[in-house]
Every structure is written in structure tokens, then in C-alpha cells.
């Protein structure tokens, strides 16, 4: 344990591992080294290097389930909202949609909605955010205008949105400082677009430092789906996040690690019993 593996070689009898100050041999070798997420916990590209050494295809990696960072102008406008969370529907350019909470942070946007969509977002793309997924905003505004024409638009929106968010959007000129009866059709349509189709182009993500998973990795086509053994290299197995398998939030990535380990173990047990 806690020994660095310096090299791995294979011959007809199995594998030879050079460690710090010692050599270890084995018939079967299981790579369970994870991805690149959270390097502070010891993440490294070791598993990918082993796969490439033995001729297996490794797909490009990037951070997944990770917060977005924002371009400086937008970030400076929204930093005061750090800690504010709202229900949302967020849509990627490829059409993937998640309905989860969105969280404003000092660095950009986070929360389950953003973490989920980050795995489907590509640099340079926009995401569309609906901050009022449970409200037909046009109908709501028209009904409130008929019932309370002198009520301020700000207070009306605060029924469904956090007060801090409404106040900040008004300061930024996104919400007119008017009463409901003063809200004209053009401004109402612009407001509806702002709150239900807020298009944001992230500057990037927070990267592997805070990512919960790594996208990409050892190509699953290189491995047996039943045993996790490399098709080209008998006796070499890959399990867990080192593979190109990524799940949603909710324990799916843990389950993949456990399930792939179980499948591998069943094969090792069967081989040993022969």
C-alpha cells in the first residue's frame, strides 16, 4: 500500500510491477485508479498511461459534473448573488435538458442543474436557463395586472423569485422599475425572454479541482462488457471511473464503480476456480 508504481510490464506468465524499492508479480492486473477529478485526493493519469502503453484507445478527458465560471463582465454583475439558489430548467445546445436547482456563486454558476448540464456542454456554447420553470409568466403578469395594477413589477416577481435576485436584475436594467399598469407589451416580452430563456455563454468550468467526475477515459470498446478485461491484453482489467463511463448526479457513478468491480471480481473468481 502507498507504494508508487514506476512501471508495468507483461510477459507470458503475467505482469511485473516495479515499485519503490521492490518488484511485484501477478497473473492478473486490475486498474482501478479513477479519473483526474479532485487532484487533491490523489487523482492522476496513471490508468490512462497503462492503457495507452498496452495499445488501448483512450478518449480525450475533461471535467464533468462541474460548476461553470463566467466571463468577467457578467461575473462582476452577478457576484453579489452568491448563495442565492433558484429552481430552474437548463438546456444545452445539443437539446439536453435538466430540471434542478441553480446556485449563484462567487466564481459563476453551480448547483445540480449546472453540474448536470456541464457534462453535455462544449466550450464556446451557450446554455439556456429558465428561472421560472413552474410559472406561465405571461399569464401570471396579465392576471396580476388586472388584479393589482398599481403593484410594482419588482414585488410581483418576488412572489416567485428570490428578492435579492429581483433587486439585482432591476439594478442591472433587466427588470423595469415600473408598476404593472406601466409595463408595456414590448418590455413585458423582453422580461419574459430574460427570465425564461436567459442565454449564458460560460467562460469555462472550475476544472478537475472541483469536478465530481472525469469525462472520457479508456474506450469501453476496448473492454469486455461482461468482465471488464481488455480484449487485446488478456489478464488486464479496467474498472470504475478510469473508463469512459459517466453517470448523472445521484450515486450513479458510485454504482458504476461498484458494478464494474463486481463484474471483474466474478471473472477473477471464475478463472481462479478453474
Where in this protein do the model-derived segments appear?
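A conserved short coil-to-beta-strand element within the FAD-binding core of flavoproteins
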Residues: 1-14
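Short loop/edge segments at beta-strand edges and connector loops
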Residues: 1-3, 60-62, 240
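Short hydrophobic core segments
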Residues: 5, 23-43, 51-52, 102-107, ...
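Acidic, glycine-enriched active-site microenvironments
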Residues: 14-18, 25-28
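A conserved FAD-binding loop/helix module that cradles the flavin
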Residues: 35-54, 245-273
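Glycine-rich phosphate/pyrophosphate-binding beta-alpha loops
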Residues: 37-39, 67-68, 105, 109-112, ...
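An anion/pyrophosphate-binding glycine-rich loop and adjacent beta-alpha core
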Residues: 56-60, 66-186
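A glycine-rich dinucleotide-binding beta-alpha-beta segment and adjacent secondary-structure elements
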Residues: 167-246
Amino acid at each position: 500500500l502507498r507504494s508508487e508504481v514506476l512501471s508495468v510490464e507483461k510477459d507470458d506468465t503475467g505482469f511485473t510491477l516495479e515499485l519503490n524499492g521492490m518488484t511485484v508479480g501477478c497473473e492478473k492486473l486490475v486498474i482501478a485508479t479513477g479519473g483526474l477529478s479532485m487532484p487533491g485526493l490523489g487523482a492522476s493519469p496513471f490508468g490512462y498511461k497503462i492503457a495507452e502503453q498496452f495499445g488501448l484507445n483512450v478518449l480525450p478527458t475533461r471535467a464533468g459534473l462541474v460548476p461553470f465560471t463566467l466571463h468577467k463582465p457578467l461575473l462582476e454583475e452577478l457576484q453579489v448573488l452568491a448563495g442565492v439558489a433558484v429552481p430552474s430548467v437548463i438546456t444545452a445546445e445539443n437539446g439536453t435538458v435538466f430540471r434542478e436547482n441553480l446556485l449563484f456563486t462567487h466564481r459563476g454558476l453551480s448547483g445540480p442543474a449546472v453540474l448536470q448540464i456541464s457534462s453535455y456542454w462544449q466550450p464556446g456554447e451557450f446554455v439556456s436557463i429558465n428561472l421560472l420553470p413552474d410559472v406561465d409568466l405571461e399569464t401570471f403578469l396579465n392576471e396580476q395586472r388586472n388584479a393589482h395594477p398599481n403593484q410594482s413589477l419588482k414585488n410581483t416577481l418576488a412572489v416567485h423569485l428570490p428578492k435579492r435576485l429581483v433587486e439585482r436584475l432591476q439594478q442591472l436594467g433587466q427588470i423595469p422599475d415600473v408598476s404593472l399598469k406601466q409595463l408595456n407589451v414590448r418590455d413585458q416580452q423582453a422580461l419574459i425572454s430574460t427570465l425564461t430563456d436567459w442565454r449564458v455563454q460560460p467562460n469555462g468550468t472550475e476544472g478537475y479541482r472541483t469536478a465530481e467526475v472525469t469525462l472520457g477515459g479508456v474506450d469501453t470498446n476496448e473492454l469486455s462488457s461482461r468482465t471488464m478485461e481488455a480484449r487485446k491484453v488478456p489478464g488486464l482489467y479496467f474498472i470504475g471511473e478510469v473508463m469512459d463511463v459517466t453517470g448523472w448526479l445521484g450515486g450513479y457513478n458510485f454504482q458504476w464503480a461498484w458494478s464494474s468491480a463486481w463484474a471483474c471480481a466474478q471473472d477473477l473468481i471464475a478463472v481462479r476456480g478453474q
